[in-house]
Amino acid sequence: MNKAPQPTGPPPARSPGLPQPAFPPGQTAPVVFSTPQATQMNTPSQPRQGGFRSLQHFYPSRAQPPSSAASRVQSAAPARPGPAPHVYPAGSQVMMIPSQISYSASQGAYYIPGQGRSTYVVPTQQYPVQPGAPGFYPGASPTEFGTYAGAYYPAQGVQQFPASVAPAPVLMNQPPQIAPKRERKTIRIRDPNQGGKDITEEIMSGARTASTPTPPQTGGSLEPQPNGESPQVAVIIRPDDRSQGAAIGGRPGLPGPEHSPGTESQPSSPSPTPSPPPILEPGSESNLGVLSIPGDTMTTGMIPMSVEESTPISCETGEPYCLSPEPTLAEPILEVEVTLSKPIPESEFSSSPLQVSTALVPHKVETHEPNGVIPSEDLEPEVESSTEPAPPPLSPCASESLVPIAPTAQPEELLNGAPSPPAVDLSPVSEPEEQAKKVSSAALASILSPAPPVAPSDTSPAQEEEMEEDDDDEEGGEAESEKGGEDVPLDSTPVPAQLSQNLEVAAATQVAVSVPKRRRKIKELNKKEAVGDLLDAFKEVDPAVPEVENQPPTGSNPSPESEGSMVPTQPEETEETWDSKEDKIHNAENIQPGEQKYEYKSDQWKPLNLEEKKRYDREFLLGFQFIFASMQKPEGLPHITDVVLDKANKTPLRQLDPSRLPGINCGPDFTPSFANLGRPALSNRGPPRGGPGGELPRGPAGLGPRRSQQGPRKETRKIISSVIMTEDIKLNKAEKAWKPSSKRTAADKDRGEEDADGSKTQDLFRRVRSILNKLTPQMFQQLMKQVTQLAIDTEERLKGVIDLIFEKAISEPNFSVAYANMCRCLMALKVPTTEKPTVTVNFRKLLLNRCQKEFEKDKDDDEVFEKKQKEMDEAATAEERGRLKEELEEARDIARRRSLGNIKFIGELFKLKMLTEAIMHDCVVKLLKNHDEESLECLCRLLTTIGKDLDFAKAKPRMDQYFNQMEKIIKEKKTSSRIRFMLQDVLDLRQSNWVPRRGDQGPKTIDQIHKEAEMEEHREHIKVQQLMAKGSDKRRGGPPGPPINRGLPLVDDGGWNTVPISKGSRPIDTSRLTKITKPGSIDSNNQLFAPGGRLSWGKGSSGGSGAKPSDTASEATRPATLNRFSALQQTLPAENTDNRRVVQRSSLSRERGEKAGDRGDRLERSERGGDRGDRLDRARTPATKRSFSKEVEERSRERPSQPEGLRKAASLTEDRGRDPVKREATLPPVSPPKAALSVDEVEKKSKAIIEEYLHLNDMKEAVQCVQELASPSLLFIFVRLGIESTLERSTIAREHMGRLLHQLLCAGHLSTAQYYQGLYETLELAEDMEIDIPHVWLYLAELITPILQEDGVPMGELFREITKPLRPMGKATSLLLEILGLLCKSMGPKKVGMLWREAGLSWREFLAEGQDVGSFVAEKKVEYTLGEESEAPGQRTLAFEELRRQLEKLLKDGGSNQRVFDWIDANLNEQQIASNTLVRALMTTVCYSAIIFETPLRVDVQVLKVRARLLQKYLCDEQKELQALYALQALVVTLEQPANLLRMFFDALYDEDVVKEDAFYSWESSKDPAEQQGKGVALKSVTAFFNWLREAEDEESDHN
């Protein structure tokens, strides 16, 4: 708990010259500051508890409440006089109780002789005084009175304010401590001078001994307190020596500060209403010293009250309660103001009687500070006037004239609505004008009026807050109060019965009368309190209860009858706080003075001896074993079934009154109230527990009861509800539970727009994931169309799509090119932001932010790795350490892969111009600064990807710096060899002008994968044939030798198969045979095989082989092409040498672009083969580029007996195998560029330019690169490579390449001669290509057609030039027809015919001699080229698919039937209009537009009704109707035969009279094989329709 430790010490030393009582060990003598020397009392510390500080010493532990209530006198008993009091002997227990006493308005100053110290005493320093020293007042010494101090209650969650002025002390008998919250404690009073004799009975019965203090008695007030508690009575309290002495020496004749009741409205928790200052009347036999508190005010909830002080005069014991006249002393003014924000200095009250003038006029106490603190400057005059003589006090003794004194000390509990402290009234007459904001004294002298009534005190809630703000002033006031405190001794008087009754009531309600001075700085405590640091276990008061705040002050006019009745009234508030627990008041009424449950030892902590430590023996503690509190489960403990707490749920210990539960749920009471401990039952004990109105005491916010101060707990108490296992426990059901789509009802689907949007968003994400999973280079175009059709219209959806694409891109770096291209297509996508719909955010910005976030994620990854490394190092076992090590390695590997994937993706984005060079340079610099391996690896990946784009003339100095740094890293050898080699590879790549040694290992197309699979299967088949042929050869007994001599096709160059196999049982090792047939398995010097294999796939389908054959035999066993006609070779005789040579020769055509060195290596290897003679001659051909025609002629001469099919296949193989060999030629590093590039250099650079252009589609950069070649005479190589590299790629790639060539021609960088020369080399082989590429003419047309557009080559010139190499082969018209067809699609037949005629072209130029032009034109449908006939549109351009698209566009645009008629008449001739093609296209389009694409699919009959006239016009007979039904059948099959769709169409068509019955029957019985797809399912779906049709006919026939 947050209470300051206060050690218990021995009794204080005796002060010289003062009579001191003897105290038992552990009990500190009370102190009264009456010595001339201003000695501060320092009481040994003791453990603090909750409750009022001044009563702490007399409370037992909160965990030890009395088991039964002690009997006491009813609070309503009238006040009665007691026996004559006596002067306290030295050993009597006395205590100073600060109290606000009202006097007559005598303003005369008084002088107390012997008081030579300052008015104020420092509250924090207290010194022991030797007992027995002579004092100024007879029978009293400073040790007999506890210093008055504000108690610090760490257990109470209230605001505490510093005390600034010690109230006037009044010496009185030591009252028993009020029981803490919920405690039922019987207070025992023992006399230490009589050996600890219990004198409680004597005190409570009215008798007294010579050494026993007599407690005062207070009357109860019928007025309710602001917090709903009943008025409190004064209690007998032992002096608290910890607090500072109160100051004497007030200002005679000066009233206290004005303080009107309504001057302050406080928002905090209420305090009891202050009572008017009591007026002491003569008649007291003992001397009562009243101290005037000048200057600063107390800060424990007190409001300054002004009373006139009387100089204490020594009286003899036994005299009645009167004030002896003292002519030299003025009637003292008691000004006591206590607030709870700081410790309250404990004032001591003298036992000498007070002389109060009858002419006293009550003064209003006015608080000038917000918290009720009197400014220090106002206090100085009081100190100075304390020495003035006072008028003689009144001597008559009249207990009835005593005015009630409001309690002065009010602990923090009361500030939050706790019961007001008991007040001792010195007169039954109260002063109403002082009622509002005064707080009466917290203690009285024990010899005060026999029946002083109680007046409630009040400290409004706002005062508490304002008091907290004035801590500095209050502390200053404390210091001043030490200077002026003077002591007035008091004598004890007998205690009437009513006083004992009121005492018990006060004890039960736990109201402090004297609050000890706190020891720690109040500001610190207030700060802790503000944030809830102070013992939360006792914070049960809701500090902000509106009902309590607005409570008006009550109890200002208590009459004797009302004060004595002590009948609680119903409070207006709905919640009560801490010490206002009703059960305490209830039990306090039944406390008997002579009863006490627990017996305490003399040196043990007990209500009367709070100085001792809380030490208990075994027997004492075992007495609490089975009490109710011991059976309660503390807060915060784990659920243990053995705890008896659950019994409270099943058998409540008390009968619950619903009226007492206004803020909480009715149920078992788990309150660990200490007042309930040991109580047999609470259900039938008088009025309900609680204060007025029976309200249940609650903790903070009414959430639960307050807890003991013995241990901290949370502010709110958890109520554990009982669980009855027999009940049917219902589980919580989510309002929006997830359901599978198949089980979702219509209501679920219509659950609001937000759910609909969320569902649409998730559906969008699912579709994007599906598209990304399918994304391949081959599927890119069609998948991108799907992506562009997606509804990405919100920021959330856009971010989600970006995250999906990004995660996919970095997780699959091999596909980063495709993902980057997808991002490029979506770059312009913009959506409005969520916060500001008027502001848009685009795809590119969000994507770059995502890339940057991932790029800069390394710091977070490092932190995670360090944490995992630390966990691994701290692992206890080797097994755990191994597991953590695996996790760490896995995390690092994942982070590394993500970093590399992100770098690759960033590079691809840069290549697509989505990132700027500055960003990339920043990335390079950042990676280069970090010398860790991950960063360097990312750097190598990045430079490999984008180095070529960054390394241009302007950026060369910067790139040089990068590479110098990389060279330095390599030389330092501080990194691993793997990283150094990667860096070296990048350096080599730059030296080779960024031309890689190997091709880009991108993903393969599905067609390529299928072809490779077919090829592998074909290889295996050839192996089997070779083995079979070899086996048959051996059986013939032929001598082993080179296969060229025997015509076997399986011989390698190395001649391994020439080694004879011994006859016998030696088994054949098939694995070794497989190795023999594999290229490169024999020749150990085959260094060029691997590069060729790595590069072969990079050209896509045109690359073909996937491996570069290194010798002749490998070409025979594993063809380098994907020639699907290569299976024809298997049908030829194995002995046919020419067939073998055909396949071998294909490799030479691929080698023609090699350098001399590469060719020499190949020659050297070929010489080791059996047929090296033939290959040697052919391999020594010059290394110049030869025309394709010459090569074809040479091949034709070498193979005269070769079949035509194989010749074409071989020529195609040679052509397609050329590129891999050319790529091999790029392997050696290229020397720095020369003024004139060689053929090989131009070829290499041309390949790089073409690949880059096809990848980036950057026309401007490609033109610039071609210009930089500076070899205009060799640009035909660029043209040839451009055509070859795109011939088997996509249509878009060919169109792009054609546009690039057109741009080069228009810009003048490429001459027409160079263009034609490059085109010739390809066209010469076109005939051979047609075998492998049936659509080769269309593909060539797609490459050539862009040349004819916009300032290109004239049509006549182009057509005549491109047909030159094709006329001998008779293929000129094939290419021209494809070109004209493409031109008609873009320009229209009319314009194409006009261009043809303008160019002066004639078909006779291109046809073979003797071929009829007219028949050719009619057959090929190119009449538009013959003049007027071209006015009719060419029918070829409106084939079924094109016609369907045009009609679909018209219908989609909402065109009317007449518009469709007009379009058909304008674009189709009569033959096409009458054809089945139009009918099928029209039927398909109309029916498709009538489908409602929902689940399930439905037919929009209205659309068919509108379009019925359109269909009826062209479905003019049964045959046309049948064709229309066929088209409808095909459409339904395309849609995967949706249920009932065809039946709905049939019904609509029949109803609209579009199709007649005969046509339906004809369709049903049709056996046309071309229309049988899906016919069975379609017939089954319309069976009901035909049944109905037949029934309708039967009915019609019956009617007829």
UniProtKB/Swiss-Prot annotation:
Bias kind Polar residues: ranges: 34-48, 208-220, 551-562
Post-translational modification: Phosphorylated at multiple sites in vivo. Phosphorylation at Ser-1187 by PRKCA induces binding to MKNK1.
Transmembrane segments: none
Coiled-coil ranges (or none): none
Keyword Chloroplast carried by entry: no
Record-annotated W2 domain positions: 1429-1599
Record Pfam families: MA3 (PF02847), MIF4G (PF02854), W2 (PF02020)
Region (Disordered): 1-88, 173-230, 243-326, 366-501, 507-526, 541-606, 667-719, 734-760, 1029-1117, 1129-1238
Ranges of Acidic residues composition bias in the record: 463-479
A GO CC term assigned to this protein in UniProt: cytoplasm
Keywords: Acetylation, Cytoplasm, Initiation factor, Methylation, Nucleus, Phosphoprotein, Protein biosynthesis, RNA-binding, Translation regulation
Keyword Acyltransferase tagged: no
PABPC1-binding: annotated segments: 179-207
UniProt modified residues of type Omega-N-methylarginine: R80, R117, R689, R698, R1036, R1046
Region (EIF4E-binding): 611-622
N6-acetyllysine carried by residues: K606, K1099
Compositionally biased spans, kind Basic and acidic residues: 578-587, 596-606, 745-760, 1148-1180, 1188-1225
Residue numbers spanned by region Necessary but not sufficient for MKNK1-binding: 1585-1600
Modified residues (Phosphoserine): 15, 230, 324, 1032, 1081, 1096, 1147, 1149, 1187, 1189, 1196, 1211, 1231, 1238, 1597
Region annotated eIF3/EIF4A-binding, chain positions: 686-1089
Every MIF4G domain range: 765-993
MI domain sequence ranges: 1241-1363
GO BP, sorted A to Z: behavioral fear response; cellular response to nutrient levels; energy homeostasis; miRNA-mediated gene silencing by inhibition of translation; negative regulation of autophagy; neuron differentiation; positive regulation of cell growth; positive regulation of eukaryotic translation initiation factor 4F complex assembly
Entries under CDD domains matching the protein: W2_eIF4G1_like
Function: Component of the protein complex eIF4F, which is involved in the recognition of the mRNA cap, ATP-dependent unwinding of 5'-terminal secondary structure and recruitment of mRNA to the ribosome. Exists in two complexes, either with EIF1 or with EIF4E (mutually exclusive). Together with EIF1, is required for leaky scanning, in particular for avoiding cap-proximal start codon. Together with EIF4E, antagonizes the scanning promoted by EIF1-EIF4G1 and locates the start codon (through a TISU element) without scanning.
Protein name per the record: Eukaryotic translation initiation factor 4 gamma 1
Organism of provenance: Mus musculus (Mouse)
Gene: Eif4g1
